[in-house]
Amino acid sequence: MQATPGQRVRTRFAPSPTGHLHVGGLRTALYNYLYAKSMGGDFIVRIEDTDQARKVEGAERSLLNTLEVTGIVPDESFIHGGNFGPYVQSERLGIYSKYCEQLLEQKQAYYCFSTAEELEANRKLQMKQGMQPKYDRKWLPEEMGGNMPESEIRRKREEGAPFVVRMKVPDYISIMFEDMIRGPIEFDSATVDDQVLMKSDGFPTYHFASIIDDHLMEISHVIRGEEWLSSMPKHILLYEFFGWEPPKVAHLPLLLNPDRSKLSKRQGDVAAEDFISKGYSPEAIINFVALLGWNEGEGCEREVYSLDELKDKFTLRRVGKAGAVFNVEKLGWLEKQYIKARPASEIISAIKPLLQAELAKKETGMDADRLVSDDYLGQVIELMRERVNFEHEFISFSRYFYFDPEEFDEKAVAKRWVDDTNEVLGEFIEVLENTADFSADNIEAALKAFVAPREKKPAFLIHPVRILTSGVGFGPSLYHMLEVLGKETVIRRLRKGIGVVGK
Protein backbone atom coordinates (compact mmCIF):
# COMPACT_ATOMS: atom_id res chain seq x y z
CA MET A 1 0.00 0.00 0.00
CA GLN A 2 1.49 3.29 -1.07
CA ALA A 3 0.20 6.85 -1.10
CA THR A 4 -3.24 7.59 -2.50
CA PRO A 5 -2.92 8.95 -6.06
CA GLY A 6 -2.78 12.74 -5.96
CA GLN A 7 -2.12 12.85 -2.24
CA ARG A 8 1.14 14.43 -1.11
CA VAL A 9 3.00 12.17 1.28
CA ARG A 10 3.60 13.83 4.64
CA THR A 11 5.16 11.87 7.50
CA ARG A 12 6.06 12.99 10.97
CA PHE A 13 8.36 12.12 13.85
CA ALA A 14 6.82 13.24 17.12
CA PRO A 15 9.20 12.71 20.06
CA SER A 16 8.61 13.71 23.65
CA PRO A 17 11.35 16.00 25.04
CA THR A 18 12.13 13.75 28.00
CA GLY A 19 15.83 13.12 27.41
CA HIS A 20 18.13 11.65 24.81
CA LEU A 21 16.96 10.13 21.53
CA HIS A 22 16.63 6.36 21.95
CA VAL A 23 17.94 4.36 19.01
CA GLY A 24 14.40 3.09 18.48
CA GLY A 25 13.25 6.68 18.11
CA LEU A 26 16.05 7.32 15.64
CA ARG A 27 14.86 4.35 13.57
CA THR A 28 11.29 5.68 13.63
CA ALA A 29 12.52 9.10 12.50
CA LEU A 30 14.68 7.55 9.78
CA TYR A 31 11.92 5.35 8.36
CA ASN A 32 9.50 8.29 8.30
CA TYR A 33 12.15 10.43 6.60
CA LEU A 34 13.07 7.74 4.07
CA TYR A 35 9.46 6.99 3.19
CA ALA A 36 8.65 10.66 2.68
CA LYS A 37 11.74 11.27 0.56
CA SER A 38 11.26 8.09 -1.48
CA MET A 39 7.76 9.35 -2.34
CA GLY A 40 8.77 12.96 -3.01
CA GLY A 41 7.01 14.13 0.14
CA ASP A 42 7.59 16.08 3.35
CA PHE A 43 9.05 15.02 6.69
CA ILE A 44 7.87 16.91 9.78
CA VAL A 45 9.21 16.96 13.34
CA ARG A 46 6.58 17.75 15.96
CA ILE A 47 7.36 18.01 19.67
CA GLU A 48 4.83 16.22 21.87
CA ASP A 49 5.36 17.82 25.27
CA THR A 50 1.94 17.26 26.83
CA ASP A 51 3.54 15.41 29.75
CA GLN A 52 5.00 18.49 31.40
CA ALA A 53 6.20 16.59 34.48
CA ARG A 54 8.68 14.55 32.40
CA LYS A 55 9.83 17.38 30.14
CA VAL A 56 13.58 18.02 30.15
CA GLU A 57 14.63 21.59 29.42
CA GLY A 58 16.42 21.88 26.09
CA ALA A 59 15.69 18.28 25.08
CA GLU A 60 13.73 19.28 21.99
CA ARG A 61 16.71 21.14 20.51
CA SER A 62 19.00 18.27 21.44
CA LEU A 63 16.68 15.81 19.66
CA LEU A 64 16.58 17.94 16.54
CA ASN A 65 20.34 18.42 16.59
CA THR A 66 20.88 14.65 16.78
CA LEU A 67 18.59 14.13 13.80
CA GLU A 68 20.42 16.75 11.75
CA VAL A 69 23.86 15.39 12.69
CA THR A 70 22.79 12.04 11.26
CA GLY A 71 21.44 13.67 8.09
CA ILE A 72 17.73 13.50 8.93
CA VAL A 73 16.78 17.10 8.22
CA PRO A 74 13.06 17.93 8.54
CA ASP A 75 11.16 20.02 6.03
CA GLU A 76 9.07 21.49 8.85
CA SER A 77 9.69 21.82 12.59
CA PHE A 78 9.63 24.32 15.43
CA ILE A 79 12.97 25.60 14.10
CA HIS A 80 12.52 25.15 10.35
CA GLY A 81 9.01 26.60 10.36
CA GLY A 82 6.23 25.62 7.97
CA ASN A 83 2.58 26.28 7.16
CA PHE A 84 1.12 23.94 9.78
CA GLY A 85 2.57 25.24 13.05
CA PRO A 86 2.97 25.62 15.88
CA TYR A 87 5.02 22.41 15.91
CA VAL A 88 5.14 22.16 19.72
CA GLN A 89 2.00 20.77 21.35
CA SER A 90 2.17 22.97 24.44
CA GLU A 91 1.69 25.91 22.06
CA ARG A 92 -1.52 24.37 20.65
CA LEU A 93 -3.63 24.01 23.82
CA GLY A 94 -6.43 26.21 22.49
CA ILE A 95 -6.81 23.93 19.49
CA TYR A 96 -7.23 20.83 21.65
CA SER A 97 -9.74 22.57 23.95
CA LYS A 98 -11.87 23.47 20.94
CA TYR A 99 -12.03 19.89 19.70
CA CYS A 100 -12.62 18.56 23.20
CA GLU A 101 -15.68 20.81 23.47
CA GLN A 102 -16.90 19.42 20.16
CA LEU A 103 -16.80 15.83 21.45
CA LEU A 104 -18.53 16.85 24.67
CA GLU A 105 -21.30 18.49 22.65
CA GLN A 106 -21.56 15.41 20.44
CA LYS A 107 -21.91 13.20 23.55
CA GLN A 108 -18.81 11.25 22.54
CA ALA A 109 -16.83 12.44 25.57
CA TYR A 110 -17.71 13.11 29.20
CA TYR A 111 -16.39 14.67 32.40
CA CYS A 112 -14.82 12.31 34.94
CA PHE A 113 -14.29 13.34 38.57
CA SER A 114 -12.92 10.02 39.88
CA THR A 115 -9.93 10.51 42.19
CA ALA A 116 -6.58 8.79 41.76
CA GLU A 117 -7.35 6.71 44.85
CA GLU A 118 -10.68 5.55 43.40
CA LEU A 119 -9.07 4.65 40.10
CA GLU A 120 -6.33 2.64 41.82
CA ALA A 121 -8.81 0.78 44.03
CA ASN A 122 -10.90 -0.07 40.99
CA ARG A 123 -7.82 -1.27 39.08
CA LYS A 124 -6.75 -3.58 41.93
CA LEU A 125 -10.26 -5.00 42.27
CA GLN A 126 -10.51 -5.77 38.56
CA MET A 127 -7.10 -7.44 38.53
CA LYS A 128 -8.04 -9.50 41.59
CA GLN A 129 -11.11 -10.68 39.69
CA GLY A 130 -8.98 -11.60 36.68
CA MET A 131 -10.35 -8.76 34.57
CA GLN A 132 -8.51 -6.40 32.25
CA PRO A 133 -8.27 -3.06 34.13
CA LYS A 134 -10.61 -0.47 32.59
CA TYR A 135 -12.35 2.64 33.82
CA ASP A 136 -15.62 1.64 35.53
CA ARG A 137 -17.59 4.51 33.94
CA LYS A 138 -18.73 5.80 37.31
CA TRP A 139 -19.13 9.29 35.85
CA LEU A 140 -20.70 8.30 32.53
CA PRO A 141 -23.85 10.48 32.28
CA GLU A 142 -27.29 8.93 32.19
CA GLU A 143 -27.95 10.51 28.80
CA MET A 144 -24.94 8.59 27.41
CA GLY A 145 -26.02 5.26 28.85
CA GLY A 146 -24.38 5.62 32.27
CA ASN A 147 -25.68 6.03 35.81
CA MET A 148 -24.49 9.52 36.78
CA PRO A 149 -27.22 12.20 36.91
CA GLU A 150 -26.46 15.38 34.97
CA SER A 151 -27.24 17.37 38.13
CA GLU A 152 -24.36 15.69 40.01
CA ILE A 153 -21.95 16.41 37.16
CA ARG A 154 -23.10 20.05 37.11
CA ARG A 155 -22.66 20.32 40.89
CA LYS A 156 -19.10 19.01 40.72
CA ARG A 157 -18.21 21.47 37.98
CA GLU A 158 -19.70 24.39 39.90
CA GLU A 159 -17.65 23.39 42.95
CA GLY A 160 -14.50 23.56 40.83
CA ALA A 161 -13.63 19.92 41.47
CA PRO A 162 -10.70 18.65 39.37
CA PHE A 163 -11.73 16.55 36.40
CA VAL A 164 -10.53 14.87 33.24
CA VAL A 165 -12.42 14.37 30.00
CA ARG A 166 -12.80 10.80 28.72
CA MET A 167 -13.90 9.48 25.35
CA LYS A 168 -16.95 7.22 25.28
CA VAL A 169 -15.97 4.01 23.52
CA PRO A 170 -18.96 2.43 21.73
CA ASP A 171 -20.01 -0.94 23.11
CA TYR A 172 -19.80 -4.21 21.19
CA ILE A 173 -18.37 -3.10 17.89
CA SER A 174 -15.42 -4.29 15.80
CA ILE A 175 -12.71 -1.75 15.06
CA MET A 176 -10.78 -2.64 11.92
CA PHE A 177 -7.90 -1.06 10.04
CA GLU A 178 -5.18 -1.96 7.57
CA ASP A 179 -1.55 -1.82 8.69
CA MET A 180 0.96 -1.31 5.88
CA ILE A 181 3.33 -3.83 7.46
CA ARG A 182 1.03 -6.25 9.28
CA GLY A 183 -2.04 -6.29 7.06
CA PRO A 184 -5.66 -6.20 8.33
CA ILE A 185 -6.10 -5.93 12.11
CA GLU A 186 -9.30 -6.09 14.14
CA PHE A 187 -10.05 -5.12 17.75
CA ASP A 188 -13.16 -5.66 19.87
CA SER A 189 -14.30 -2.40 21.47
CA ALA A 190 -14.91 -4.34 24.69
CA THR A 191 -11.13 -4.39 25.17
CA VAL A 192 -10.78 -0.62 24.74
CA ASP A 193 -10.82 1.70 27.75
CA ASP A 194 -12.58 5.07 27.90
CA GLN A 195 -9.33 6.90 27.27
CA VAL A 196 -8.61 10.21 28.99
CA LEU A 197 -8.51 12.95 26.34
CA MET A 198 -7.90 16.06 28.46
CA LYS A 199 -6.05 15.89 31.77
CA SER A 200 -6.87 17.86 34.90
CA ASP A 201 -3.99 20.26 34.17
CA GLY A 202 -5.64 21.33 30.91
CA PHE A 203 -3.17 19.45 28.73
CA PRO A 204 -4.34 16.81 26.25
CA THR A 205 -3.12 13.24 26.37
CA TYR A 206 -0.90 11.90 23.61
CA HIS A 207 -3.79 10.01 22.04
CA PHE A 208 -6.00 13.07 21.68
CA ALA A 209 -3.38 15.61 20.65
CA SER A 210 -1.66 13.38 18.13
CA ILE A 211 -4.75 12.56 16.07
CA ILE A 212 -5.81 16.24 16.00
CA ASP A 213 -2.33 17.34 14.96
CA ASP A 214 -1.97 14.57 12.37
CA HIS A 215 -5.25 15.69 10.79
CA LEU A 216 -4.56 19.43 10.88
CA MET A 217 -0.99 18.97 9.66
CA GLU A 218 -2.27 16.77 6.81
CA ILE A 219 -0.12 13.81 7.82
CA SER A 220 -0.73 11.09 5.24
CA HIS A 221 1.21 8.24 6.85
CA VAL A 222 1.88 7.46 10.52
CA ILE A 223 4.93 5.20 10.88
CA ARG A 224 5.73 4.31 14.49
CA GLY A 225 6.76 1.52 16.84
CA GLU A 226 4.82 -1.66 17.49
CA GLU A 227 4.15 -0.55 21.08
CA TRP A 228 1.53 1.89 19.73
CA LEU A 229 -0.46 -0.81 17.96
CA SER A 230 -2.80 -1.31 20.93
CA SER A 231 -3.67 2.41 20.82
CA MET A 232 -5.00 2.24 17.28
CA PRO A 233 -8.64 1.44 18.24
CA LYS A 234 -8.85 4.67 20.26
CA HIS A 235 -7.33 6.63 17.42
CA ILE A 236 -9.62 5.10 14.80
CA LEU A 237 -12.64 5.94 16.96
CA LEU A 238 -11.51 9.54 17.42
CA TYR A 239 -11.15 9.95 13.67
CA GLU A 240 -14.67 8.60 13.27
CA PHE A 241 -16.02 10.92 15.99
CA PHE A 242 -14.66 13.93 14.08
CA GLY A 243 -15.60 12.59 10.65
CA TRP A 244 -11.98 12.67 9.48
CA GLU A 245 -10.17 10.30 7.15
CA PRO A 246 -7.41 8.58 9.17
CA PRO A 247 -3.87 8.47 7.78
CA LYS A 248 -2.39 5.20 6.64
CA VAL A 249 -0.45 3.48 9.42
CA ALA A 250 2.58 1.21 9.71
CA HIS A 251 3.80 -0.25 13.00
CA LEU A 252 7.50 -1.10 13.07
CA PRO A 253 8.85 -4.28 14.71
CA LEU A 254 10.27 -4.18 18.21
CA LEU A 255 14.00 -3.81 18.75
CA LEU A 256 15.47 -6.78 20.60
CA ASN A 257 18.68 -7.56 22.46
CA PRO A 258 20.80 -10.44 21.11
CA ASP A 259 19.06 -12.70 23.67
CA ARG A 260 15.76 -11.55 22.08
CA SER A 261 14.61 -9.64 25.15
CA LYS A 262 13.11 -6.22 24.45
CA LEU A 263 15.60 -3.38 24.08
CA SER A 264 14.77 -0.83 26.77
CA LYS A 265 15.46 2.87 27.18
CA ARG A 266 16.64 2.04 30.69
CA GLN A 267 19.55 0.02 29.37
CA GLY A 268 22.88 1.73 28.89
CA ASP A 269 24.17 2.82 25.51
CA VAL A 270 20.88 2.83 23.61
CA ALA A 271 20.75 6.58 23.03
CA ALA A 272 21.81 7.82 19.61
CA GLU A 273 23.91 10.49 21.31
CA ASP A 274 25.91 7.77 23.09
CA PHE A 275 27.01 6.26 19.80
CA ILE A 276 27.89 9.65 18.35
CA SER A 277 29.98 10.57 21.41
CA LYS A 278 31.85 7.26 21.20
CA GLY A 279 32.99 8.13 17.71
CA TYR A 280 30.63 6.21 15.45
CA SER A 281 30.10 8.17 12.26
CA PRO A 282 26.63 9.44 11.31
CA GLU A 283 26.85 7.38 8.11
CA ALA A 284 27.46 4.12 9.99
CA ILE A 285 24.77 4.87 12.58
CA ILE A 286 22.13 5.58 9.94
CA ASN A 287 23.17 2.53 7.91
CA PHE A 288 22.95 0.35 11.04
CA VAL A 289 19.58 1.70 12.13
CA ALA A 290 18.14 1.32 8.61
CA LEU A 291 18.87 -2.41 8.74
CA LEU A 292 16.97 -2.86 12.02
CA GLY A 293 13.88 -4.27 10.36
CA TRP A 294 14.40 -3.43 6.68
CA ASN A 295 16.27 -5.15 3.86
CA GLU A 296 16.49 -4.41 0.17
CA GLY A 297 15.05 -7.72 -1.00
CA GLU A 298 15.09 -11.50 -0.84
CA GLY A 299 18.56 -12.88 -1.35
CA CYS A 300 20.21 -9.46 -1.21
CA GLU A 301 23.32 -9.67 0.95
CA ARG A 302 24.32 -6.04 0.60
CA GLU A 303 24.67 -4.23 3.93
CA VAL A 304 26.41 -0.91 3.25
CA TYR A 305 24.16 1.94 2.09
CA SER A 306 24.56 5.70 1.98
CA LEU A 307 21.65 7.88 3.05
CA ASP A 308 20.99 8.83 -0.57
CA GLU A 309 20.90 5.16 -1.55
CA LEU A 310 18.48 4.43 1.28
CA LYS A 311 16.19 7.23 0.10
CA ASP A 312 16.15 5.61 -3.31
CA LYS A 313 15.65 2.00 -2.19
CA PHE A 314 13.54 2.19 0.97
CA THR A 315 10.02 0.78 0.92
CA LEU A 316 7.71 -0.27 3.74
CA ARG A 317 7.03 -3.48 1.81
CA ARG A 318 10.50 -4.64 2.85
CA VAL A 319 10.03 -3.93 6.57
CA GLY A 320 9.46 -7.14 8.53
CA LYS A 321 7.01 -7.94 11.29
CA ALA A 322 9.40 -9.91 13.51
CA GLY A 323 11.53 -8.17 16.12
CA ALA A 324 14.86 -6.80 14.88
CA VAL A 325 17.97 -7.78 16.85
CA PHE A 326 20.11 -4.85 17.99
CA ASN A 327 23.71 -6.07 17.80
CA VAL A 328 26.27 -3.35 18.42
CA GLU A 329 28.97 -5.55 16.87
CA LYS A 330 27.25 -5.01 13.54
CA LEU A 331 27.52 -1.27 14.05
CA GLY A 332 31.24 -1.68 14.72
CA TRP A 333 31.63 -3.70 11.53
CA LEU A 334 29.82 -1.03 9.52
CA GLU A 335 32.00 1.70 11.01
CA LYS A 336 35.08 -0.22 9.85
CA GLN A 337 33.67 -0.43 6.32
CA TYR A 338 33.15 3.33 6.23
CA ILE A 339 36.64 4.02 7.55
CA LYS A 340 38.14 1.77 4.89
CA ALA A 341 36.20 3.50 2.12
CA ARG A 342 36.41 7.09 3.33
CA PRO A 343 38.76 9.31 1.29
CA ALA A 344 41.91 10.27 3.17
CA SER A 345 41.14 13.94 2.56
CA GLU A 346 37.89 13.65 4.55
CA ILE A 347 39.63 11.90 7.44
CA ILE A 348 42.40 14.51 7.43
CA SER A 349 39.83 17.32 7.64
CA ALA A 350 38.23 15.59 10.62
CA ILE A 351 41.34 14.69 12.62
CA LYS A 352 43.63 17.64 11.91
CA PRO A 353 41.87 20.00 14.37
CA LEU A 354 42.00 17.28 17.04
CA LEU A 355 45.71 16.78 16.47
CA GLN A 356 46.43 20.50 16.48
CA ALA A 357 44.66 20.78 19.84
CA GLU A 358 46.80 17.92 21.19
CA LEU A 359 50.02 19.46 19.89
CA ALA A 360 49.14 22.78 21.51
CA LYS A 361 49.03 21.07 24.90
CA LYS A 362 51.98 18.69 24.66
CA GLU A 363 55.58 18.78 23.45
CA THR A 364 56.04 16.42 20.54
CA GLY A 365 59.78 16.09 19.98
CA MET A 366 59.03 16.16 16.24
CA ASP A 367 58.45 18.78 13.56
CA ALA A 368 54.90 19.91 14.41
CA ASP A 369 54.35 21.47 10.98
CA ARG A 370 55.17 18.17 9.32
CA LEU A 371 52.86 16.25 11.65
CA VAL A 372 49.79 18.26 10.60
CA SER A 373 50.66 18.27 6.91
CA ASP A 374 48.27 16.49 4.57
CA ASP A 375 51.14 14.38 3.24
CA TYR A 376 52.16 13.06 6.66
CA LEU A 377 48.61 12.46 7.89
CA GLY A 378 47.77 10.72 4.62
CA GLN A 379 50.63 8.27 5.18
CA VAL A 380 49.49 7.58 8.75
CA ILE A 381 45.92 7.00 7.59
CA GLU A 382 46.90 4.47 4.93
CA LEU A 383 49.04 2.56 7.45
CA MET A 384 46.35 2.51 10.14
CA ARG A 385 43.07 2.10 8.19
CA GLU A 386 42.84 -1.61 8.91
CA ARG A 387 43.70 -1.18 12.59
CA VAL A 388 41.42 1.56 13.85
CA ASN A 389 37.77 1.20 14.82
CA PHE A 390 36.92 4.91 14.90
CA GLU A 391 38.12 7.98 13.08
CA HIS A 392 39.51 9.56 16.26
CA GLU A 393 41.76 6.50 16.72
CA PHE A 394 43.94 7.80 13.90
CA ILE A 395 45.21 9.96 16.75
CA SER A 396 44.39 8.22 20.04
CA PHE A 397 45.40 4.73 18.87
CA SER A 398 48.28 6.05 16.80
CA ARG A 399 49.97 8.46 19.21
CA TYR A 400 53.48 7.24 18.43
CA PHE A 401 53.19 8.90 15.02
CA TYR A 402 52.96 12.27 16.80
CA PHE A 403 54.60 11.91 20.21
CA ASP A 404 57.68 10.10 21.52
CA PRO A 405 56.65 7.16 23.73
CA GLU A 406 56.79 7.99 27.44
CA GLU A 407 56.69 4.36 28.55
CA PHE A 408 57.18 0.94 27.04
CA ASP A 409 54.91 -2.09 27.20
CA GLU A 410 56.41 -4.12 30.06
CA LYS A 411 55.04 -7.46 28.87
CA ALA A 412 56.38 -6.88 25.37
CA VAL A 413 59.80 -5.90 26.75
CA ALA A 414 59.93 -8.97 29.00
CA LYS A 415 59.10 -11.17 26.03
CA ARG A 416 61.50 -9.64 23.51
CA TRP A 417 64.61 -8.59 25.46
CA VAL A 418 67.58 -10.87 26.08
CA ASP A 419 71.08 -10.15 27.36
CA ASP A 420 72.56 -8.83 24.12
CA THR A 421 69.48 -7.05 22.73
CA ASN A 422 70.66 -3.54 23.58
CA GLU A 423 74.16 -4.23 22.31
CA VAL A 424 72.85 -5.44 18.94
CA LEU A 425 70.41 -2.53 18.82
CA GLY A 426 73.26 -0.08 19.33
CA GLU A 427 75.12 -1.54 16.37
CA PHE A 428 71.96 -1.47 14.23
CA ILE A 429 71.44 2.21 14.98
CA GLU A 430 74.76 2.91 13.25
CA VAL A 431 73.50 1.00 10.21
CA LEU A 432 70.36 3.13 10.11
CA GLU A 433 72.42 6.30 10.43
CA ASN A 434 74.28 5.28 7.30
CA THR A 435 71.12 4.42 5.35
CA ALA A 436 70.83 7.29 2.90
CA ASP A 437 67.43 6.40 1.42
CA PHE A 438 65.27 5.83 4.50
CA SER A 439 62.53 3.93 2.67
CA ALA A 440 60.66 0.86 3.89
CA ASP A 441 62.39 -1.38 1.35
CA ASN A 442 65.86 -0.11 2.25
CA ILE A 443 65.21 -0.38 5.99
CA GLU A 444 64.02 -3.97 5.57
CA ALA A 445 67.04 -4.87 3.41
CA ALA A 446 69.43 -3.24 5.89
CA LEU A 447 67.93 -5.09 8.87
CA LYS A 448 68.02 -8.48 7.18
CA ALA A 449 71.58 -7.91 5.96
CA PHE A 450 72.58 -6.87 9.48
CA VAL A 451 71.17 -9.92 11.35
CA ALA A 452 72.19 -12.59 8.81
CA PRO A 453 75.93 -12.81 9.72
CA ARG A 454 75.02 -12.70 13.41
CA GLU A 455 72.94 -15.87 12.99
CA LYS A 456 69.80 -14.15 14.25
CA LYS A 457 66.36 -13.96 12.73
CA PRO A 458 64.89 -10.59 11.67
CA ALA A 459 62.36 -10.87 14.52
CA PHE A 460 65.24 -10.49 16.99
CA LEU A 461 65.39 -6.82 16.01
CA ILE A 462 61.93 -6.19 14.55
CA HIS A 463 60.16 -6.42 17.90
CA PRO A 464 62.61 -4.38 20.01
CA VAL A 465 62.79 -1.68 17.32
CA ARG A 466 58.99 -1.50 17.25
CA ILE A 467 58.75 -1.27 21.05
CA LEU A 468 61.37 1.49 21.33
CA THR A 469 59.93 3.58 18.51
CA SER A 470 56.24 3.16 19.38
CA GLY A 471 56.10 2.04 23.01
CA VAL A 472 53.94 -0.97 22.13
CA GLY A 473 54.48 -4.46 20.79
CA PHE A 474 52.03 -4.35 17.91
CA GLY A 475 51.16 -2.12 14.99
CA PRO A 476 51.36 -1.77 11.22
CA SER A 477 54.25 -2.89 9.04
CA LEU A 478 57.38 -1.92 10.99
CA TYR A 479 59.37 -0.88 7.93
CA HIS A 480 56.62 1.39 6.64
CA MET A 481 56.07 2.80 10.12
CA LEU A 482 59.76 3.71 10.39
CA GLU A 483 59.71 5.32 6.95
CA VAL A 484 56.77 7.51 7.95
CA LEU A 485 58.34 8.48 11.28
CA GLY A 486 61.51 9.49 9.50
CA LYS A 487 65.18 8.78 10.09
CA GLU A 488 65.83 11.48 12.67
CA THR A 489 62.87 10.50 14.87
CA VAL A 490 63.61 6.76 14.64
CA ILE A 491 67.27 7.11 15.62
CA ARG A 492 66.45 9.53 18.46
CA ARG A 493 63.83 7.19 19.90
CA LEU A 494 66.08 4.14 19.60
CA ARG A 495 68.97 5.87 21.38
CA LYS A 496 66.66 7.13 24.11
CA GLY A 497 65.00 3.73 24.43
CA ILE A 498 68.11 1.62 24.94
CA GLY A 499 69.06 4.01 27.69
CA VAL A 500 65.88 3.03 29.52
CA VAL A 501 64.83 -0.47 28.48
CA GLY A 502 66.76 -3.62 29.30
CA LYS A 503 68.98 -2.01 31.91
From Swiss-Prot:
The record, for InterPro entries, names: aa-tRNA-synth_I_cd-bd, aa-tRNA-synth_I_codon-bd_sub2, aa-tRNA-synth_I_CS, aa_tRNA-synth_I_cd-bd_sf, Glu-tRNA-ligase_bac/mito, Glu/Gln-tRNA-synth, Glu/Gln-tRNA-synth_Ib_cat-dom, GluQ/Sye
Pfam families for this protein = Anticodon_2 (PF19269), tRNA-synt_1c (PF00749)
Record keywords? Aminoacyl-tRNA synthetase, ATP-binding, Cytoplasm, Ligase, Nucleotide-binding, Protein biosynthesis
- Motif 'KMSKS' region: which ranges? 262-266
User: One GO CC term of this entry?
Assistant: cytoplasm
Q: Where does ATP bind?
A: 265
* Catalysed reactions listed for this entry: tRNA(Glu) + L-glutamate + ATP = L-glutamyl-tRNA(Glu) + AMP + diphosphate
A molecular function (GO) term: ATP binding
Keyword Ligase set for record: yes
- Keyword Transport in record: no
Q: Where is this motif: 'HIGH' region?
A: 15-25
Q: What is its main location?
A: cytoplasm
The protein's Enzyme Commission number: 6.1.1.17
Localization recorded for this chain is: Cytoplasm
* Similarity annotation: Belongs to the class-I aminoacyl-tRNA synthetase family. Glutamate--tRNA ligase type 1 subfamily.
| PANTHER family referenced in this protein's UniProt entry, alphabetically | GLUTAMATE--TRNA LIGASE, GLUTAMATE--TRNA LIGASE, MITOCHONDRIAL-RELATED
- What is its biological role? Catalyzes the attachment of glutamate to tRNA(Glu) in a two-step reaction: glutamate is first activated by ATP to form Glu-AMP and then transferred to the acceptor end of tRNA(Glu).
Q: What is this protein called?
A: Glutamate--tRNA ligase
Which organism is this entry from?
Answer: Chlorobium phaeobacteroides (strain BS1)
The lineage, from the top, is: Bacteria, Pseudomonadati, Chlorobiota, Chlorobiia, Chlorobiales
**What gene is it encoded by?**
gltX
